[in-house]
């Protein structure tokens, strides 16, 4: 999803959760690379739990539950709601979440989830097949789950009254910590996070929901779209192009989101989604866009663009020479009044060339003022930091035999 679009939906969900009074507190579970982006979007008052590595929804929910239990010391009777952070929906969705939480509170079932009334047969979603209504309250016991069936099976499931699995779950905290303990026996959050790789790489649906002995579903019949695929996301865009894009009049049902400075030209394209960012370029038939995750997991490379609390950076160039010597070039922007940490590297040298703005530089506890045109060489082993007096832009060239984000030691520094 485009960063700008993601900002809007996440902030909207947090606002609606607060307005409906469903939650006493909100915690966001995400990857390490998304941490600063989330903080920039939602503010520092919302805790962010980061996965050490990407391992699917069960490990992520297990880690977040462990954080609440062992770090925040929440009661095992606390009702936990798990939901995606960017649904496209309406107010009734959040009222249904309240009903899900109430169902757990009233001990209707140990695990309660939201079922979306399907509007058409789809192979994109998992299905929840209900049985009898619990005391005629519009809460159904679950007969079985079917994960992403073919179209013929999907039609049959809908005829049986099945719901789409909306990815919203509620349970008591102790229910989840008992499951966590089966995999990692400890009561400290730090140990669970350090042993995160011991969790199976599997979805919450497969590992928990489908194995649950006591599970119920609360239906939601309002407007809902899963914006987890480009096909559904582009349906909500008011324009077919965003960014530097030229598209001819013969192109049909094509959406282009371009976050790069380079132009994208589309001539006679049909039913495509094209998304370009510093991390890569996606070109997909819209009807196949749900398969992106299968191939994206194969792309294990460092992020080429990251938002941080102090600003942002993008990787401009990387190189490796015949003798193993490497270089990496970044462009960094630091917001006015913000600073990067006081730090040292053991395996690389850096050269900073300031191209806009004014700031304060610290090298081994010695301060100086820097501005456009200044170039600073920072040898390995030298402590360094910079603070922006006005928005500061500079080019950083790293060089050495080992260039790794982990090559950093941070220190406290008072400006």
Regions picked out by a protein language model, each given a short descriptive name:
Residues 2-9:
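Short, small-residue-biased leader/transition segments that mark boundaries at the very start
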Residues 10, 64, 86, 128, ...:
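Residue-level signal for inorganic ion chemistry
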Residues 16-23:
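Short, acidic, metal-binding catalytic loop of nucleotide-sugar glycosyltransferases
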Residues 36-46:
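Acidic donor-binding segment of Leloir-type glycosyltransferases
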Residues 46-134, 177-182:
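Conserved beta-loop-beta/alpha segment of the NTase-like Rossmann-fold superfamily
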Residues 130-160:
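A short, charged helix-loop
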Residues 154-174, 180:
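A conserved mid-domain beta-alpha-beta active-site/ligand-binding segment of alpha/beta enzyme cores
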Residues 171-354, 358-376, 382-388, 402-403, ...:
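Left-handed beta-helix
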């Amino acid at each position: 999803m485009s960063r700008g679009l993601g900002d809007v939906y996440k902030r909207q969900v947090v606002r609606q959760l607060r307005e409906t009074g469903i939650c006493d507190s909100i915690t966001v579970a995400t990857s390490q690379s998304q941490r600063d982006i989330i903080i920039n979007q939602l503010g520092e008052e919302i805790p962010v739990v980061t996965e050490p590595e990407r391992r699917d929804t069960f490990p992520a929910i297990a880690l977040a539950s462990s954080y609440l239990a062992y770090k925040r010391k929440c009661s095992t009777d606390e009702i936990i709601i798990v939901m995606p952070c960017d649904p496209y929906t309406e107010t009734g969705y959040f009222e249904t979440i309240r009903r899900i939480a109430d169902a757990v509170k009233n001990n209707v079932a140990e695990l309660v989830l939201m079922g979306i009334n399907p509007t058409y047969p789809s192979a994109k979603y998992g299905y929840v097949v209900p049985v009898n209504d619990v005391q005629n309250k519009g809460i159904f016991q679950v007969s079985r789950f079917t994960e992403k069936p073919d179209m013929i099976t999907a039609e049959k499931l809908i005829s049986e009254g099945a719901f789409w699995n909306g990815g919203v779950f509620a349970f008591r905290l102790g229910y989840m910590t008992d499951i966590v303990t089966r995999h990692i026996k400890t009561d400290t959050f730090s140990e669970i996070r350090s042993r995160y790789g011991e969790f199976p790489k599997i979805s919450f649906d497969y590992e928990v929901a489908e194995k649950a002995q006591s599970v119920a579903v609360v239906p939601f019949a309002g407007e809902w779209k899963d914006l987890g695929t480009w096909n559904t996301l582009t349906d909500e865009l008011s324009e077919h192009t965003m960014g530097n894009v030229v598209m001819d009049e013969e192109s049909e049902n094509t959406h282009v989101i371009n976050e790069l400075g380079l132009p994208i030209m589309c001539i006679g394209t049909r039913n495509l989604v094209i998304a370009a960012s510093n991390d890569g370029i996606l070109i997909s038939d819209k009807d196949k866009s749900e398969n992106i995750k299968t191939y994206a997991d194969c792309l294990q490379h460092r992020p080429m663009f990251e938002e941080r609390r102090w600003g942002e950076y993008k990787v401009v160039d990387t190189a490796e020479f015949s003798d193993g010597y490497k270089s990496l070039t970044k462009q960094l922007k630091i917001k006015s009044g913000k600073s990067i940490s006081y730090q040292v590297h053991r395996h690389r040298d850096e050269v900073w060339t300031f191209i806009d703005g004014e700031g304060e530089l610290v090298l081994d506890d010695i301060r100086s003022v820097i501005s456009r045109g200044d170039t600073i060489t920072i040898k390995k082993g030298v402590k360094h930091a910079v603070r922006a007096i006005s928005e500061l832009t500079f080019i950083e060239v790293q060089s050495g035999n080992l260039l790794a984000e982990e090559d950093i030691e941070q220190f406290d520094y008072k400006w």
